[in-house]
Amino acid sequence: MRFLLLLAMATATCNALATPYPDSGRIYRDFKDDSFFKPAPRRDEPKAEIEGATPLAAEGEAIFVQGFEVHGNTLLPEERIHAILSAHQGRELSGLELHQVAEELAAAYLDAGYFAARVYLPPQAVTNGVLQLHVYEGFLEEDGIAFTNPGARLQDEQVHSFLSSNLSEGEVLTVEAVERTILLINDLPGVNSRSTLYPGEEVGSARFLLQIEEEPSISGNIDADNFGSYYTGEERLGATIYINSPSRRGDQVVVRAVTSGSDSNYGYVEYNTPLSGNGLRAGVSVDYLDYELGKQYRSLDATGNAGELRGFLAYPFLRGRHFNVFGQVDVSRLELEDSNNSGLEADRTIDKVEFSLHGDHDDDHWADGVTYYRLAVALGDVGINGNDAFKAFDDQNSETEGGFGRFNYEFARLQHIQGNLSTFLSLSGQFASQNLDSSQKFFIGGPFSVAGYPTGEISGDEGTLLHADLRYDFYNLPWRGNLQASVFYAAGWAKLFKDTWSGWNDPNPELDNHIMLQSAGFGFTQTWDETFVLRGLLGYQVGSNETEDPDSGEATDGSSKNYRAWVQGIYYF
């Protein structure tokens, strides 16, 4: 059958080059990458301001302090308090030093997360050489939560839900509870907030005031890049619109469109909304891609489409200024169709559930830095709905139909070194239970991978990607804005098929199932406020190119050059 012959030839060519056949699964992944349409970074996360701090007393007559008595403590271990105070007993202390002792004890409460706690010296604080210290641990008084809200972006009921879900009246205020409250509200689209803690009516109590500030109801970005597929158009134009809190509940509508012209078009629509004040969100999205292959496949009239319907739940297990852990569950159905004028009908349906955990943590190790991570487990089923010839081809070769599982991981570290110098290291990868459909594979090549190679130069059922760069930031430039220059090295390893079959690498028996690509180069990122970002990257191939055509020496983009240049511009509004 002519169809089988052409399909076998195409697959053999694909295997000989160790590159993925340009089908809907591969092209869909090029557009699906959410790094293309993240919103502009928001300003620094605020923290609660504290009013009512007591100034130090003036220097007074020194008093001999034999010991200490602490009243009102229920939170700190006695051993911790003794360790702090024992260094000051058995000697004379001035009035200023007495207050410094109280401040040192208050700092211990702050370190433990009780940042509304206060330590006071009562009148006649020293009796028979024993200094009395009164601790007020800073509980939130009854009816101690208040807020101001313009109301155009967020209903008062919604603000109250977040406050009451995370702050408890009558209980001691902690850094974790206050930060979580503020940040969960700031995570809501269309609003920001400022907060203040001030003394309550009772001694040792506190009140919490939140001020809601409104942001634009519509925001978004327009972007242009050359990140697209060689076969469907490398130059692309995209736009993303965020409709923030249209129902005044903290919900959001996201609309994105990307086109490379007549050869590929992609659209994405998402709606997400909070389900409760504890940060739980739910959402649904739908997207659609259509394409037509160009270059050497133009004569085949090779076309296809892909569309996914997805629902998800997301929850912040930990939300703070320095430590975050988020969990998410996605349930989706992806439908893929590929056809040409030679009888190819490669229709597939992929049902999948994915469980993911991601987060970040900043610290002051070796100066300061941020660690990022993401772990994901996906379980799914591939149904082949194409014609009998395509089903037979899959059954006799890669056998992707049926259940599958994959595990993805990513770890990254942004580390400040000194002054304007920093470094970024990342390691990501994938493991699979069996041979995967092209839409589920691990891709290597392109601006966010091994940049010396075309987008998606190779794909594997399993793979690993290592990236390291050194960055230097320039500020107050003559043309305004800030510039970050970097040099990088990246290496990717791919196992093309989890399980090979007889003749899988025909007509190139020298082809190995394990491929490694390396690249080094330099790049820049120029930003002007939070309005415009311009990125450029030049990657050179390091070592041999195991993916090149053995006859022409060309990669999948039809070029034999050993470097690739990438450019992206994003305008935020």
Predicted regions and their residues:
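Transmembrane beta-strands of outer-membrane beta-barrel proteins
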Residues: 220-222, 251-255, 280-284, 325-329, ...
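Residue-level signature of outer-membrane beta-barrel architecture
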Residues: 212, 243-245, 273-275, 315-317, ...
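Transmembrane beta-strand segments that form the barrel wall of outer-membrane beta-barrel proteins
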Residues: 219-228, 239, 250-261, 267-269, ...
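Outer membrane beta-barrel transmembrane domains
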Residues: 291-295, 330, 337-339, 391, ...
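Residues that define the transmembrane beta-barrel architecture of outer-membrane proteins
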Residues: 204-206, 233-237, 263-267, 305-309, ...
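Periplasmic polypeptide-binding modules associated with outer-membrane biogenesis and secretion
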Residues: 19-228, 257-265, 407, 427-428
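Short loop/turn motifs that connect adjacent beta-strands in outer-membrane beta-barrel proteins
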Residues: 247-252, 276-282, 318-325, 362-371, ...
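Outer-membrane beta-barrel "beta-signal"
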Residues: 241, 311, 531, 559-573
